[in-house]
């Protein structure tokens, strides 16, 4: 009797785990459709190859990042090759200073959903949030949103601004667990 109850419970656990992965699969399919609908609704032009550094981005041009499902990047502003001395608050002018691993990134952002009447979460200015989001570039333990690190690689320079379409698997933990894609407008500086 105990053995048949135990086997029944094991069977239920196996069935339940199979159902939850099917649900996750359906959620991922819905996410893919939501991203495709957003691209279509906004008439975005998708570039298949990474643009050169001096490419002038059209307003609706987005690069579909090679090797990453449903991650799209649009450069709004290239930024400059200037860094700031945080102690004296003076500019340190340099030529073509690219962001490198472990640079301390200071980020401001706006985040909104892909539905037509999506809510917006803004950390764009001190009116929205007193302190910006800070993390070291390429350190996923400080910023688990892989999409941000991918975007910074493409932004290349401090003071850059971009817009990214982020599937849940590349987002923050809360986005990953809810299988919710977002669009971010991301503005970065490098703090020394």
Residue ranges and their predicted role:
Residues 7-12, 32, 36, 50-53, ...:
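Low-complexity, intrinsically disordered short peptide segments enriched in small/polar/basic residues
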Residues 19-80:
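Acidic/polar, low-complexity intrinsically disordered N-terminal segments immediately downstream
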Residues 6, 63-67, 162-164:
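Short acidic-hydrophobic surface loop/beta-edge motif
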Residues 75-78, 85-90, 112-192:
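A beta-strand/beta-hairpin structural motif
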Residues 1-19:
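Sec-dependent bacterial lipoprotein signal peptides
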Residues 63-65, 71-106:
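Short, glycine/small-residue-enriched coil/turn segments at secondary-structure junctions
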